[in-house]
Design a protein with these regions (language model features):
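Active-site-flanking beta-strand signature of metal-NTP-handling nucleotidyl enzymes
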Residues: 7-17, 147-155
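Short, surface-exposed ligand-recognition loops at beta-strand->loop->(often short) alpha-helix junctions
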Residues: 17-29, 155-166
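Surface-exposed beta-loop interaction hotspot
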Residues: 108-153, 266-269
Length: 270
């Protein structure tokens, strides 16, 4: 995979301002009504998520996606700080900067010193039926979109090198068959709190699609079991994976999140 042309994902924890007595419903009302007007940098999109289940249930996460590494570093440097071009972007958009200031009265914004990790893409299922586009959209005369994003942190087994694990994934990614409307990504931390650590990111077209296959923590429906039975090579690939590293799902640390807001200027990455 050509790293120079693959997306970059940056994940930032977002916390409610409890000292001001902010309730989550007030924050979510703001981000849906007004926060969506905060633009993304050119070639970027942002999505605000709320934990549905797992480790960070009812907690928030901001996901930035840039179309490639050059587009990411144009605005954020290797230390997670804004570049001169990023500062200029906000100076030229005082209305957007004012919305960010209003956001900060409810919760932290996705910026230092919040916990974050910038991830590169090791591999993805390029044959997924999930179309490119925003993870959240709620606008008149357009189809509503509210995707689910699962983040599953992984760990290598003793004696397994990163090079060996990544080679296995890239050599075998063609064997991965996702559920309809799901898309698998393997990420590797490049900076921030989870440097050099791996995560599986699953983007799912809707909450209904998640529940059609896995309505609860590690619960599989009949539809999911039929899919597995029909795609045995994928299951064999996952068994081989488990000899090298932990796999997505319990007992690993993971959270399924629901998209609750996102930038409405949809010049999103391809």
């Amino acid at each position: 995979m050509n790293v120079s042309t693959t997306p970059v994902f940056s994940l930032h924890y977002v916390g409610i301002n409890l000292k001001r007595g902010i309730a989550s419903d007030r924050f979510e009302d703001f981000v849906r009504r007004k926060g969506v007007a905060i633009p993304a940098y050119p070639g970027w999109q942002w999505t605000l998520l709320r934990g549905l289940r797992g480790e960070r249930e009812n907690q928030y996460l901001m996901v930035y996606q840039a179309k490639d590494a050059a587009t990411y570093t144009r605005y954020i440097d290797g230390n997670g700080e804004l570049t001169d071009e990023a500062h200029a972007f906000w100076r030229q958009r005082p209305e957007a900067a004012a919305l960010i200031e209003e956001w900060r009265t409810f919760a932290t914004f996705a910026e230092l010193p919040t916990l974050y990790t910038c991830y590169s893409l090791v591999a993805e299922n390029s044959r997924s039926s999930l179309p490119p586009g925003p993870n959240y959209r709620d606008q008149p005369r357009q189809e509503s979109i509210q995707r689910v994003i699962g983040i599953h942190n992984l760990a290598l087994k003793a004696g397994v090198t990163p090079q060996r694990f990544e080679r296995f994934i890239t050599d075998n990614i063609h064997r991965v068959e996702d559920y309809p409307g799901w898309k698998f990504h393997l990420l590797k931390g490049q900076s921030g709190n989870r440097l050099d650590q791996y995560a599986v990111m699953l983007i799912i077209e809707s909450l209904a699609s998640l529940n059609a296959f896995h309505p609860d923590l590690d619960v599989s429906t009949e539809q999911a079991l039929r899919f597995v039975a029909e795609h045995q090579d994928t299951e064999h690939m996952y068994d081989e994976w488990k000899t090298l590293a932990s796999f997505s799902g319990a007992p690993q640390i993971y959270t399924d999140y629901l998209a609750i807001s996102g930038n409405e200027n949809h010049a999103h990455p391809a």
